UniProtKB/Swiss-Prot annotation:
CDD domains: RNase_HI_prokaryote_like (cd09278)
Superkingdom to which the source organism belongs: Bacteria
Self-association state and partner proteins as the record states: Monomer.
Positions bound to Mg(2+) 2: D12, D136
Top EC class of this enzyme: hydrolase
Family: Belongs to the RNase H family.
Matching InterPro entries: RNase_H, RNaseH-like_sf, RNaseH_domain, RNaseH_sf, RNaseHI
GO CC aspect terms: cytoplasm
Binding locations of Mg(2+) 1: D12, E50, D72
Cofactor info, note text: Binds 1 Mg(2+) ion per subunit. May bind a second metal ion at a regulatory site, or after substrate binding.
Organism listed in the record: Shewanella frigidimarina (strain NCIMB 400)
Protein name per UniProt: Ribonuclease H
An example Gene Ontology biological process: DNA replication, removal of RNA primer
Amino acid sequence: MAELKQLYIFTDGSCLGNPGPGGYGVVMKYKHQQHEIADGFSLTTNNRMELLAPIIALETLYEPCNIILTSDSQYMRQGIMTWIHGWKKKGWITSTKQPVKNVDLWKRLDAVSQLHKIDWHWVKGHAGHIENERCDVLARKAAEAKPQQVDTGYNPE
């Protein structure tokens, strides 16, 4: 079996108002190459953007990879590493017997992450981590750009 390519992915989400206009930012590194992705939505939440960032990054890959994925979102990291197993067993119901919020994105993240070997890392936001700061700028600019794109999965309660 061929050795998997080693990638480093950094992600962040931003929302102005929460809910409000939102965006995500991604920095992907492979060897000496760096690629950035960002996009915005007219109405969404911070948590949805924190989930969408790694989804978009992973969906751009065309082959299985060994990935170190770094985010400042404990919600995303805890969810994909710990909570999701119970949610799936209970039919996407939380421990408090409520439907899992953002289930559309959790299902996408679960599916796309199965294709890769991923180490999920957390970094404190706004603490000077170069790639996290860059993702924050990308996400904020995408949110501030008056995006017209609709987050079809956003469901205000």
